[in-house]
């Protein structure tokens, strides 16, 4: 993880679209990062894709220029995440992979580890990646166009 925030900051700061993929226990973290952090706070178009549905159509949008955050969970759905990631590695280039195992979640007992994916991923995405991207874009993540600014 050390240094990855700088890579993301430098490579993603000018991207108009960033996909976020997660599945199973990481789907919530992927969704929050996509709609709350990237869309709401950074004004970046960001579809959230479920890794279990990726090879049913969304994979047709992939090319070497599409940035994609990929969350690889620990637990029963990990093989589904790994399958999508294998495809992405073959045909994509702008991949930013957060693997729960590399973040140390496998130190927890396997009977409960998958329940902590969201907590681990959200901490990194919301507190590290969002902030670094915000600094690089010179776009404070507290800024809003409409939320709390106009009646809606």
Which role does the model predict for each range below?
Residues 1-8:
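Short, small-residue-biased leader/transition segments that mark boundaries at the very start
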Residues 8-152:
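A SIS-like phosphosugar-recognition module
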